[in-house]
Amino acid sequence: MSISNIIHGTCSPEYAALGNAFKENFTERNEIGASLAMVVDGELVVDLWGGVKDQQTSKAWEADTLVNVWSTTKGLTATCFAMLVSRGLLTYDTKVAQHWPEFAQQGKQDITVAMLLSHQAGLCGFLEPTSLEQLYDSSASAARLAAMEPLWPPGTAHGYHALTAGYLANELFMRVEGRSIRDFIAEELHSKHGLELYIGLPPEKAAQAATIMAQSGMTSSQAALELTTVQLAAMANPILSPTLPNTAGWRAAEIPSANGFATARALATLYGSLAQSGILNETQLVEPSVLAQATSPQISGVDLVMGVDIRWGCGFLCNSLNLYGTSPKAFGHSGWGGSFAFADPDRRLGLAYTMNSMGSELVGDPRNVAIMNAVYG
């Protein structure tokens, strides 16, 4: 099959290098199925997709193909909180226990919303053995975390809350807004703005979903460099298979830190709006002053779980080491395996990449590097 039959969509001529990098992900970097989108000044200038969404059936990746984006989901959750703050329903300085009294147990009474969203709460995982079935119960998981003693003094360090960030955020969100993050996204972003963004996979969207593929033996515990107690709790309790998103249990669950399903087009459109002072379809999703707070580093340094230097905003990854280009103002989130989405306010762009072939790199996936080099040179 020629590459012209693999790649579909549109790419403005001035971004031909980006289109070529996407094609080369298939011809040179073993991509299987993927989509790439970029919005500049509110205009969709790159909208490409290609390959297959299921290697066994050879079904083509289509314009509306959805795929699990793992922790790229966290950027959606961060955006939802920024929308709540913009609506005056809470502030980032608000103490979590003000809205969720049970959370104050075990010395957690002074943890703020900002601390919770920036992975400072010390609740990055469970110490007691945990099953997949327990992970799929968001409310019960949130209750366990509310009763838990932090793994480090809150506010003194940060450790990536890979899954638990979703339970914590969802429970707080419901206490404040009334709706779950899944329902909020469905109503405020999908229904109102047509964005193909979901927490979990709605049953009626099953035919659009890509099948995740990974190398044999790949697990979530490989993402931790040294399995300390904190890392074991965060990354290996339980150990997750990268193909878990293909299962009915995962798709039905509500884990707004990891089981988001999306198109690159929808992610790029959302981040494109955040790159333009929070305006989407002439609607002020997020106030500029709130966006500035949400994307300002709350804490930085070596992450206790990931073992690399990270700057955390209020749920967003703040740009460092040119992860999201050259602008220090850029922000976004990346997911296990290679998906990512970000905004660059200096260039007024939003970009997203989604795929179904799980890469093994913690940082520096060759597909991502090629895409970023094509944008920033």
Task: Locate each region found by the language model.
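Short, conserved catalytic-motif segment at the N-terminal edge
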Residues: 6-69, 91-94
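Active-site helix/loop module of the DD-peptidase/beta-lactamase fold
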Residues: 63, 68-72, 84-128, 146-147, ...
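Active-site-proximal alpha-helical segments within enzyme catalytic domains
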Residues: 119, 165-172, 258-280, 339-356
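Short, charged, amphipathic alpha-helices and their helix-cap/turn boundaries
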Residues: 48, 131-153, 179-196, 238-243
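Flexible glycine/proline-enriched surface loops and loop-helix/loop-strand junctions
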Residues: 62-64, 148-155, 165-168, 247-256
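Active-site SXXK
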Residues: 16, 22-23, 42, 65-94, ...
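Short, gly/Ser/Thr-rich active-site loops of penicillin-recognizing serine hydrolases
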Residues: 255, 276, 295-302, 361-377
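Active-site Gly/Thr loop motif
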Residues: 210-264, 292-347
